[in-house]
Amino acid sequence: MSFQLTLECADSGGALDSPRDPKRRRATLAAALQILLIAMLIVLGTSSCFDRQKKTSTSTTREVVDEAGRHVQLATHIDRIVSLAPNLTEIVYAVGAGEHLVGDTEYCDYPAAAKNVAKIGDTIHPSIERIMALKPQVVLVSTASQLEAFTKQLDEQKIAVYVTNPRSLEEVFRSIETLGDLFGHHDGAASLVTDMRARSFTVEVAMRSVRPVRVFYQVSGEPLYTIGRESYLTDLVRRAGGTSVTADVPGAFPRYSDEAALAARPEAIILPSGGSMGTANSTPAAALKNSPAVLNNRVYKINDDHLSRPGPRLIDGLEEMARALHPGAFK
């Protein structure tokens, strides 16, 4: 816009008014000046808006909402990550951000490179002092680790904490995509999730013609723990052609009574065992010894690392569970 042109038009007595009428000429000039003022305000306002956008785009921090609904201030470029759960460590490596992992737990043993990362203790009792010494820009926490109090301590130390809490396979996919974006590895995360979705779909197709099997998922036998309606594993059992007999039990990993287990009469029992668990949880609980699952020899051991870690290898667990429950569907 040319301010000079506007004033010249007003002063020349063109089509807007007659130069022989002083009153009309003054009115026209006043109108032109008003237009000029408005135009200047618009330009100044636009400039201010651009300045604000520029400040935002060049800011060193950004606000995100984690899976616990918490507002978290994160660095725009994350170069130092600490992971407090094996599944999160696996995700960091799988999306291509492994070089930025500066600390993890003693249980983080996959991939092999994770074993060489500085250890900050175990999942339940990590060391705040060790974490602070590593100067992370973000600490990744899984709610499955029951670290609410610890998360509060980190917040008090002004260390950013990002919590994940997937309750289904689909939410695991979203967790991977979100973490990939946060770490600047969108393409790596997208490629990984595309592959996982394709494998999940193959299982889905195979399960379309099967009758769902009543499944008891034994997290531990003594004391007896299982999966509830808030666990991603309840969704995984369904996708593998089963129906968890504890799907309506509140919580993610509830304690379960022997009486309830006896009354459930599952057709199959899943025992997450092996892997980092070793031989633990390798036999059904005593309360299940007379269940149809035990009597019909339908007790299946599946690598615990493929089930208890909601990350890239969860698809391995899905495939293994589906093949155990419905071997004929994959011939």
Positions of predicted regions on the chain:
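Bacterial signal peptide processing site
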Residues: 50-52
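His/Asp/Glu-enriched short active-site or ligand-binding loop at hydrolase and phosphoryl-transfer sites
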Residues: 105, 230-253, 273, 298-301
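A short, structured surface patch at a secondary-structure boundary
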Residues: 61, 80-145, 150, 245, ...
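Extracytoplasmic substrate-binding proteins
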Residues: 70-71, 137-138, 148-225, 246-248, ...
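Short helices/loops that flank or line small-molecule/ion binding pockets
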Residues: 128-135, 157, 256-265
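Bacterial N-terminal signal peptides
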Residues: 34-45
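Short secondary-structure boundary segments
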Residues: 85, 143-144, 219, 249, ...
